[in-house]
């Protein structure tokens, strides 16, 4: 039986996430399953052995004690998505299953661990990070001796960017550490568990590795995907 990778559904460019995992990547032993807050197929969560938490609309500020009014606030939030992805993350964590967070996924993991985000990073930083007609690009630095550094095997590089929120460095979640940051303004670009003892693979990035221009060449896409897939392939259920 094939191991399943569950990708949380987003209404924003979901096809990019599906297409990122090619037939060659998945081989004969892995397959993708869509975990959709619209279908509310919670029964499929327990069928998966790895999860991708995708990008998309802002998380409800009420979940982290944030302000309800701010720049670029969406006209409506998706509380059903927030609840659905909370179930995914809690299941993954309790069963020690690999998780990859992307953009909103990074922010939501920090929130679920008790941390907070900036509701909006401000016009100066938005000029660097917020998508206009196309993704922005900027330089990041990888923190030494982190999981992300061991995966990418580089100290610095260029990533794409399409966000107006970011993790507050003074409000990191429980057991969360920074693994990358923007060179220009210090915005947090990567997180992972600080204490990895008896923890499964968990890596989250603020950029979009699934839609980088040269994703098959970039260590910020190719290496991350390979590491996550390997974590799913080699995962063995822990004694819980």
Regions found by a protein language model. Give the residues of each.
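Cytosolic ligand/metal-binding cores
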Residues: 107
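N-terminal beta1-alpha1 cap of cysteine-dependent amidohydrolase-like domains
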Residues: 1-100, 111-118, 122-155, 164, ...
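Short basic/aromatic active-site micro-motif
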Residues: 161
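Conserved G/P- and acidic residue-centered "switch" motifs that form tight phosphate/ATP-binding loops
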Residues: 103
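Active-site-proximal beta-strand elements of phosphoester/diester hydrolases
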Residues: 203-206
